[in-house]
Amino acid sequence: MTTLLQQQGSANLWERFCQWVTSTENRFYVGWFGVLMIPTLLTATICFILAFVAAPPVDIDGIREPVAGSLLYGNNIITAAVVPSSNAIGLHFYPIWDAANLDEWLYNGGPYQLIVFHFLLGIFSYMGREWELSYRLGMRPWIAVAYSAPVAAATAVLLVYSIGQGSFSDGLPLGISGTFNFMFVLQAEHNVLMHPFHMLGVAGVFGGALFSAMHGSLVTSSLIRETTETESQNSGYRFGQEEETYNIVAAHGYFGRLIFQYASFNNSRALHFFLAAWPVIGIWFASLAVACFAFNLNGFNFNQSLLDSQGRVINTWADILNRANLGIEAMHERNVHNFPLDLAAGDQAPVALQAPAING
């Protein structure tokens, strides 16, 4: 009898836990994806703060030349970063227990892997949690689909690029200046600016910002007057009201006359789908661009494509960009490589064209 009561009690406890996890009445929806999201994001956040503030220098290139990234080692908020794990580690999984001691783990950049893996699991779970909550509320799943764009971008620069290049030392440093360095090196080695997927990503980000500003300003300019001049116009809206708060006909008429009629949406649903889809598709393509770079599918090469009648090169902007790429490539990791890969890959010129003949 006692055993039966204990089993029922444990079953009831589990059922109550399941109901709490999946309840949409909580102030903060947890969900089954949240059970994974909360510990992984907390772990990544705590480790990031500790590493950003106090981590010792990391031998990122694997040549015993450590790079200091933390605040306590002389950096400021702009220059500080969590330095990627060492090139000596490569793509090996490097948890704390694989190192001989904590000092070795820190020297080889172990915190970077810990942060990146937990962070990626956390944002994947957050995306799943968005879908889960939408499902339980009877909503469509497009919030999670939209969030997949930044998730894909983060995965590309933190994981896919490292895998393609063969080492986590090639991943994105977790800091402001480190991000800029990553962008410069990516451009130098892969000609990012000449890749069509990057161009689509730029169109998505800047176009999305433009369309968002246009939409917000049009709506704000065509609000239905509900207040006096001495009141805030925001007081004219009541949360949950059924009537429209702005005049879409007026906004459509204004924008149609400003440009031309068919440049303006006359369907609010189509308009908002467009506002969501444009930047999301653009960032998807930007993520695909980084995935291409990971496996050295680089931007277009139009170097020295114009020649005069004498066969001399007429420089284009592609040639000037290529010169900048070579300069950046020559300067980064200067103690690892003697020459940029593009310069070192040519045919070797023999020192002696012909061995001297010895006449006895």
Curated annotation (Swiss-Prot):
Membrane topology annotation: Multi-pass membrane protein
Note: Cyanobacteria usually contain more than 2 copies of the psbA gene.
Stated name of the protein: Photosystem II protein D1 3
Annotated gene: psbA3
UniProt-listed Enzyme Commission number(s): 1.10.3.9
Residues spanning the membrane: 29-46, 118-133, 142-156, 197-218, 274-288
Free-text remark on how the cofactor is bound: The D1/D2 heterodimer binds P680, chlorophylls that are the primary electron donor of PSII, and subsequent electron acceptors. It shares a non-heme iron and each subunit binds pheophytin, quinone, additional chlorophylls, carotenoids and lipids. D1 provides most of the ligands for the Mn4-Ca-O5 cluster of the oxygen-evolving complex (OEC). There is also a Cl(-1) ion associated with D1 and D2, which is required for oxygen evolution. The PSII complex binds additional chlorophylls, carotenoids and specific lipids.
Post-translational modification: Tyr-161 forms a radical intermediate that is referred to as redox-active TyrZ, YZ or Y-Z. C-terminally processed by CtpA; processing is essential to allow assembly of the oxygen-evolving complex and thus photosynthetic growth.
Role played: Photosystem II (PSII) is a light-driven water:plastoquinone oxidoreductase that uses light energy to abstract electrons from H(2)O, generating O(2) and a proton gradient subsequently used for ATP formation. It consists of a core antenna complex that captures photons, and an electron transfer chain that converts photonic excitation into a charge separation. The D1/D2 (PsbA/PsbD) reaction center heterodimer binds P680, the primary electron donor of PSII as well as several subsequent electron acceptors.
Site (Tyrosine radical intermediate): Y161
NCBIfam families per the UniProt record, alphabetical: psbA
Catalytic activity: 2 a plastoquinone + 4 hnu + 2 H2O = 2 a plastoquinol + O2
